[in-house]
Amino acid sequence: MKLLRYGPSGQEKPGILDSAGRIRDLSAHVPDLAGDVLSDAGLARLRAIDPATLPLVSGEPRIGACVGHVGKFIGIGLNYADHAAEAGMPVPKEPVVFGKWTSSICGPNDGIDIPKGSVKTDWEVELGVVIGAKCKDVDEARALDYVAGYCVVNDVSEREWQIERGGQWDKGKGFDTFGPIGPWLVTRDEVPDPQRLDLWLEIDGHRYQNGNTRTMVFTVAQLVAYLSTCMTLQPGDVITTGTPPGVGMGVKPSPVFLKAGQTVRLGIEGLGEQLQRTRNAQ
Protein backbone atom coordinates (compact mmCIF):
# COMPACT_ATOMS: atom_id res chain seq x y z
CA MET A 1 0.00 0.00 0.00
CA LYS A 2 0.94 3.61 -0.55
CA LEU A 3 -0.44 5.54 2.41
CA LEU A 4 -0.38 9.31 2.76
CA ARG A 5 -1.74 12.27 4.68
CA TYR A 6 -3.34 15.19 2.91
CA GLY A 7 -4.83 18.57 3.78
CA PRO A 8 -3.73 21.81 5.45
CA SER A 9 -0.83 21.70 7.88
CA GLY A 10 -2.04 20.45 11.25
CA GLN A 11 -5.34 19.23 9.77
CA GLU A 12 -4.13 16.32 7.64
CA LYS A 13 -6.40 13.38 6.91
CA PRO A 14 -5.27 9.80 6.22
CA GLY A 15 -5.46 8.55 2.66
CA ILE A 16 -4.40 5.78 0.33
CA LEU A 17 -3.49 5.74 -3.34
CA ASP A 18 -5.72 3.60 -5.52
CA SER A 19 -4.54 1.61 -8.55
CA ALA A 20 -4.90 4.70 -10.75
CA GLY A 21 -2.75 6.81 -8.43
CA ARG A 22 -5.71 8.79 -7.07
CA ILE A 23 -6.10 9.71 -3.41
CA ARG A 24 -8.86 7.94 -1.49
CA ASP A 25 -9.95 9.12 1.94
CA LEU A 26 -9.39 6.76 4.89
CA SER A 27 -10.67 8.99 7.67
CA ALA A 28 -13.85 6.94 8.17
CA HIS A 29 -11.64 3.99 9.11
CA VAL A 30 -8.66 5.48 10.99
CA PRO A 31 -8.08 8.89 12.59
CA ASP A 32 -4.50 9.21 11.37
CA LEU A 33 -1.50 7.23 10.13
CA ALA A 34 0.06 6.93 13.55
CA GLY A 35 0.49 4.63 16.52
CA ASP A 36 -1.22 1.24 16.36
CA VAL A 37 -2.54 1.94 12.85
CA LEU A 38 1.05 1.23 11.73
CA SER A 39 1.18 -2.21 13.35
CA ASP A 40 0.94 -5.36 11.25
CA ALA A 41 -2.65 -5.82 12.43
CA GLY A 42 -3.54 -2.21 11.74
CA LEU A 43 -2.07 -2.31 8.26
CA ALA A 44 -3.82 -5.63 7.58
CA ARG A 45 -7.16 -3.97 8.34
CA LEU A 46 -6.39 -1.20 5.86
CA ARG A 47 -5.22 -3.73 3.28
CA ALA A 48 -8.59 -5.49 3.52
CA ILE A 49 -10.40 -2.34 2.36
CA ASP A 50 -11.11 -2.04 -1.36
CA PRO A 51 -9.85 1.47 -2.24
CA ALA A 52 -12.59 1.75 -4.89
CA THR A 53 -15.16 1.86 -2.06
CA LEU A 54 -13.50 4.87 -0.41
CA PRO A 55 -14.36 8.51 -1.15
CA LEU A 56 -12.28 9.99 -3.95
CA VAL A 57 -10.38 13.14 -2.94
CA SER A 58 -10.90 15.85 -5.52
CA GLY A 59 -8.43 18.45 -6.72
CA GLU A 60 -4.77 18.58 -5.77
CA PRO A 61 -4.62 18.87 -1.98
CA ARG A 62 -1.46 19.63 -0.08
CA ILE A 63 0.39 16.43 0.86
CA GLY A 64 1.58 16.31 4.45
CA ALA A 65 4.24 14.18 6.11
CA CYS A 66 3.20 10.55 5.60
CA VAL A 67 3.32 9.76 9.34
CA GLY A 68 1.47 11.60 12.10
CA HIS A 69 2.44 12.17 15.72
CA VAL A 70 6.07 11.15 15.22
CA GLY A 71 7.61 10.45 18.61
CA LYS A 72 11.28 10.20 17.62
CA PHE A 73 12.94 11.44 14.44
CA ILE A 74 16.33 9.72 14.45
CA GLY A 75 19.15 10.56 12.07
CA ILE A 76 22.10 8.41 11.02
CA GLY A 77 25.26 10.15 9.85
CA LEU A 78 28.05 9.08 7.49
CA ASN A 79 26.26 5.87 6.54
CA TYR A 80 27.63 5.77 2.98
CA ALA A 81 31.41 5.37 2.80
CA ASP A 82 31.76 7.66 -0.21
CA HIS A 83 29.75 10.39 1.56
CA ALA A 84 32.05 10.12 4.58
CA ALA A 85 35.01 10.58 2.24
CA GLU A 86 33.56 13.72 0.64
CA ALA A 87 32.88 15.12 4.13
CA GLY A 88 36.48 14.42 5.12
CA MET A 89 35.42 12.13 7.95
CA PRO A 90 36.32 8.50 8.71
CA VAL A 91 33.87 5.70 8.00
CA PRO A 92 32.29 5.03 11.40
CA LYS A 93 32.80 1.75 13.24
CA GLU A 94 29.35 2.12 14.82
CA PRO A 95 26.34 4.11 13.59
CA VAL A 96 26.53 7.87 14.12
CA VAL A 97 23.21 8.71 15.76
CA PHE A 98 21.69 12.18 16.11
CA GLY A 99 18.25 13.65 16.67
CA LYS A 100 16.16 15.72 14.32
CA TRP A 101 13.51 17.66 16.23
CA THR A 102 9.98 16.64 15.33
CA SER A 103 9.17 20.35 14.87
CA SER A 104 11.31 20.17 11.71
CA ILE A 105 8.89 17.74 10.05
CA CYS A 106 6.90 19.04 7.10
CA GLY A 107 5.25 17.83 3.93
CA PRO A 108 7.26 16.60 0.94
CA ASN A 109 6.39 19.61 -1.20
CA ASP A 110 6.38 22.31 1.47
CA GLY A 111 8.93 25.10 1.21
CA ILE A 112 12.36 24.89 2.85
CA ASP A 113 13.16 27.89 5.05
CA ILE A 114 16.77 29.07 4.85
CA PRO A 115 17.56 30.10 8.45
CA LYS A 116 18.33 33.75 9.13
CA GLY A 117 21.99 34.44 8.39
CA SER A 118 22.62 30.97 6.96
CA VAL A 119 25.00 30.58 4.03
CA LYS A 120 25.54 26.82 4.46
CA THR A 121 22.13 25.17 4.18
CA ASP A 122 22.59 21.79 2.49
CA TRP A 123 20.55 18.88 1.14
CA GLU A 124 20.56 15.11 1.78
CA VAL A 125 18.24 12.59 0.10
CA GLU A 126 17.70 9.67 2.46
CA LEU A 127 15.68 6.50 2.91
CA GLY A 128 13.26 6.89 5.80
CA VAL A 129 12.23 3.89 7.89
CA VAL A 130 8.94 4.03 9.81
CA ILE A 131 8.64 1.78 12.86
CA GLY A 132 5.40 -0.17 13.19
CA ALA A 133 5.76 -2.01 16.52
CA LYS A 134 7.39 -1.47 19.89
CA CYS A 135 10.96 -2.58 19.45
CA LYS A 136 13.54 -3.21 22.19
CA ASP A 137 16.70 -5.34 22.04
CA VAL A 138 15.78 -7.06 18.78
CA ASP A 139 18.32 -8.98 16.76
CA GLU A 140 19.23 -8.14 13.19
CA ALA A 141 17.50 -11.22 11.77
CA ARG A 142 14.10 -10.04 13.06
CA ALA A 143 14.61 -6.28 12.88
CA LEU A 144 12.67 -5.68 9.66
CA ASP A 145 9.60 -7.32 11.20
CA TYR A 146 9.24 -4.15 13.27
CA VAL A 147 9.19 -1.86 10.23
CA ALA A 148 5.84 -0.55 8.98
CA GLY A 149 7.24 0.85 5.76
CA TYR A 150 9.56 3.24 3.98
CA CYS A 151 9.51 6.81 2.70
CA VAL A 152 11.61 9.60 1.23
CA VAL A 153 13.30 12.06 3.60
CA ASN A 154 15.27 15.21 2.82
CA ASP A 155 17.63 15.57 5.78
CA VAL A 156 18.14 19.31 5.28
CA SER A 157 21.19 20.46 7.25
CA GLU A 158 22.81 23.77 8.19
CA ARG A 159 26.53 22.94 8.12
CA GLU A 160 27.81 25.86 10.19
CA TRP A 161 25.48 25.00 13.05
CA GLN A 162 26.08 21.27 12.57
CA ILE A 163 29.87 21.22 12.30
CA GLU A 164 31.55 24.55 12.94
CA ARG A 165 29.84 25.82 16.08
CA GLY A 166 30.79 22.96 18.41
CA GLY A 167 28.66 20.54 20.39
CA GLN A 168 26.26 18.04 18.88
CA TRP A 169 25.06 17.81 15.27
CA ASP A 170 21.43 18.12 16.37
CA LYS A 171 21.22 21.90 16.30
CA GLY A 172 22.20 22.03 12.62
CA LYS A 173 19.67 19.34 11.72
CA GLY A 174 16.51 20.54 13.41
CA PHE A 175 15.55 23.94 12.03
CA ASP A 176 11.91 24.32 11.04
CA THR A 177 11.17 22.72 7.63
CA PHE A 178 14.41 20.68 7.75
CA GLY A 179 12.50 17.37 7.74
CA PRO A 180 10.33 16.88 4.64
CA ILE A 181 8.87 13.35 4.82
CA GLY A 182 6.87 11.54 2.13
CA PRO A 183 4.93 11.70 -0.12
CA TRP A 184 3.96 8.14 0.72
CA LEU A 185 4.49 5.58 3.40
CA VAL A 186 5.06 2.49 1.26
CA THR A 187 4.35 -0.59 3.35
CA ARG A 188 7.06 -3.15 4.00
CA ASP A 189 5.46 -5.83 1.83
CA GLU A 190 5.95 -3.63 -1.26
CA VAL A 191 9.68 -3.11 -0.62
CA PRO A 192 11.20 -6.60 -0.77
CA ASP A 193 14.77 -5.35 -0.28
CA PRO A 194 15.42 -1.89 1.20
CA GLN A 195 19.10 -2.32 0.26
CA ARG A 196 18.40 -2.18 -3.47
CA LEU A 197 16.81 1.24 -3.94
CA ASP A 198 18.07 4.00 -6.22
CA LEU A 199 17.92 7.49 -4.73
CA TRP A 200 18.69 10.88 -6.27
CA LEU A 201 18.45 14.63 -5.78
CA GLU A 202 18.52 17.65 -8.11
CA ILE A 203 18.84 21.39 -7.52
CA ASP A 204 17.38 23.57 -10.28
CA GLY A 205 17.50 20.59 -12.63
CA HIS A 206 21.16 19.72 -11.94
CA ARG A 207 21.63 16.25 -10.49
CA TYR A 208 23.94 16.31 -7.48
CA GLN A 209 23.10 12.99 -5.82
CA ASN A 210 22.71 9.63 -7.54
CA GLY A 211 23.14 6.60 -5.30
CA ASN A 212 21.78 3.26 -4.18
CA THR A 213 21.05 1.98 -0.70
CA ARG A 214 23.21 -1.10 -1.35
CA THR A 215 26.28 1.04 -0.50
CA MET A 216 25.12 1.79 3.05
CA VAL A 217 27.72 1.09 5.72
CA PHE A 218 25.02 -0.21 8.09
CA THR A 219 21.89 -1.79 6.62
CA VAL A 220 18.35 -0.95 7.67
CA ALA A 221 18.17 -4.17 9.70
CA GLN A 222 21.46 -3.39 11.43
CA LEU A 223 20.32 0.14 12.26
CA VAL A 224 16.98 -0.96 13.72
CA ALA A 225 18.68 -3.63 15.83
CA TYR A 226 21.41 -1.22 16.99
CA LEU A 227 19.01 1.57 17.92
CA SER A 228 16.76 -0.86 19.78
CA THR A 229 19.62 -1.63 22.15
CA CYS A 230 19.91 1.97 23.35
CA MET A 231 16.28 3.08 23.20
CA THR A 232 12.80 1.64 22.82
CA LEU A 233 11.54 2.30 19.33
CA GLN A 234 7.82 3.04 19.17
CA PRO A 235 5.23 2.88 16.36
CA GLY A 236 5.55 6.00 14.24
CA ASP A 237 9.20 6.66 15.04
CA VAL A 238 11.13 7.62 11.90
CA ILE A 239 14.76 6.69 11.21
CA THR A 240 16.45 8.54 8.38
CA THR A 241 19.31 6.32 7.31
CA GLY A 242 22.02 8.53 5.82
CA THR A 243 22.79 10.00 2.44
CA PRO A 244 24.91 9.02 -0.57
CA PRO A 245 27.60 11.38 -1.91
CA GLY A 246 26.75 14.60 -3.71
CA VAL A 247 25.82 16.94 -0.88
CA GLY A 248 26.62 20.61 -1.28
CA MET A 249 29.50 20.74 1.17
CA GLY A 250 31.27 18.03 -0.84
CA VAL A 251 31.16 19.79 -4.22
CA LYS A 252 34.64 20.41 -5.67
CA PRO A 253 36.47 22.72 -6.02
CA SER A 254 34.10 24.86 -3.94
CA PRO A 255 31.07 23.85 -1.86
CA VAL A 256 27.60 24.78 -3.09
CA PHE A 257 24.76 25.62 -0.71
CA LEU A 258 21.08 26.42 -1.02
CA LYS A 259 19.83 29.95 -1.62
CA ALA A 260 16.31 31.33 -1.58
CA GLY A 261 14.39 30.82 -4.81
CA GLN A 262 15.80 27.44 -5.79
CA THR A 263 13.95 24.22 -6.62
CA VAL A 264 14.90 20.97 -4.89
CA ARG A 265 13.63 17.71 -6.39
CA LEU A 266 14.45 14.29 -4.98
CA GLY A 267 13.15 10.76 -4.98
CA ILE A 268 13.68 7.10 -4.21
CA GLU A 269 12.79 4.19 -6.47
CA GLY A 270 9.23 3.07 -5.72
CA LEU A 271 8.75 5.57 -2.88
CA GLY A 272 7.83 8.72 -4.79
CA GLU A 273 9.31 12.18 -5.23
CA GLN A 274 9.52 15.43 -3.29
CA LEU A 275 9.58 18.95 -4.75
CA GLN A 276 10.52 21.95 -2.63
CA ARG A 277 11.17 25.64 -3.18
CA THR A 278 13.63 27.39 -0.91
CA ARG A 279 12.84 30.70 0.76
CA ASN A 280 14.32 32.92 3.43
CA ALA A 281 12.93 32.27 6.91
CA GLN A 282 10.82 35.12 8.23
From Swiss-Prot:
Does Metal-binding appear among the keywords? yes
**Is Cell membrane one of the keywords UniProt gives this record?**
no
- Which cofactors, if any, are listed as required? Mg(2+)
Q: Which InterPro entries match?
A: FAH, Fumarylacetoacetase-like_C, Fumarylacetoacetase_C_sf
- Binding, Mg(2+): E124, E126, D155
Can you tell which superkingdom this protein's organism belongs to? Answer: Bacteria
Keyword line:
Hydrolase, Magnesium, Metal-binding
**Which enzyme class?**
hydrolase
Record GO biological process: urate catabolic process
Where is the chain membrane-spanning?
Answer: none
Query: Mind telling me which Pfam families this protein's record contains?
Result: FAA_hydrolase (PF01557)
Entry's Gene Ontology molecular function annotations: hydrolase activity; metal ion binding; ureidoglycolate lyase activity
Report the EC number(s), separated by commas if there are several: 3.-.-.-
Describe the family membership recorded for this protein in Swiss-Prot or TrEMBL.
Belongs to the FAH family.
Spell out the protein name for this chain. Putative hydrolase Bcenmc03_4750
Q: Which organism is it from?
A: Burkholderia orbicola (strain MC0-3)
